């Protein structure tokens, strides 16, 4: 009974946090009612900083943090649970986000080292917006240290990251840049992690570069018992302490 009671309270806490969120369609409105129309009419991406209709994405400066950006599709994709992300014709949004990291350096006024950058997408239960968006921002000092300490323990198969991150369990998988270019992390998660294909919306996903120039994919799964909303954004620090 105690376990059932705790589970109920945990679920209710997550529900309350979700209900407190602001309009979940703000980003979708910005893309389809502002950025795209302004670009099509005036060749001006504002309020986005980049609009690429042919490539299928836009980039927007987020209001949170001095250097955080969001990459979003120009089609209606709600989030990580969308089957469209598994379609071969869908752009490789994670790799496009990695290429868009240069906007951080331009805003900062000098080159930002790749080890300081991270890309994340939250689960359907760990996000506040219902339009697909990848957070391009700094990695937290704690997450960077944890990944550095486990560099040699991360291999090309999904396996638990020793110690997890932010008190939550994570799976980690090493990929080369060539693999990241050729295959979407969403497809790798869906096809390679047991039963992930059944509950893609329960996962948060992140991409971070390692000191050996490989990349690590990080996946965390929604778990109400540990109050894990699978918000992979938790490994980021939008104030960018890693740069100071």
From Swiss-Prot:
Pathway: Phospholipid metabolism; CDP-diacylglycerol degradation; phosphatidate from CDP-diacylglycerol: step 1/1. Keywords: Cell inner membrane, Cell membrane, Hydrolase, Lipid biosynthesis, Lipid metabolism, Membrane, Phospholipid biosynthesis, Phospholipid metabolism, Transmembrane, Transmembrane helix. Signal peptide: none annotated. Belongs to the Cdh family. Its EC number is 3.6.1.26. One of its GO terms (molecular function) is CDP-diacylglycerol diphosphatase activity. It holds the Pfam family CDH. This is CDP-diacylglycerol pyrophosphatase. It is found in: Cell inner membrane. The chain crosses the membrane at residues 7-23. It comes from the Bacteria. GO terms for cellular component: plasma membrane. Its main location: membrane. It is a single-pass membrane protein. GO terms for biological process: CDP-diacylglycerol catabolic process; phospholipid biosynthetic process. Gene3D superfamilies: HIT family - CDH-like. It catalyses: a CDP-1,2-diacyl-sn-glycerol + H2O = a 1,2-diacyl-sn-glycero-3-phosphate + CMP + 2 H(+). It comes from Helicobacter pylori (strain ATCC 700392 / 26695).
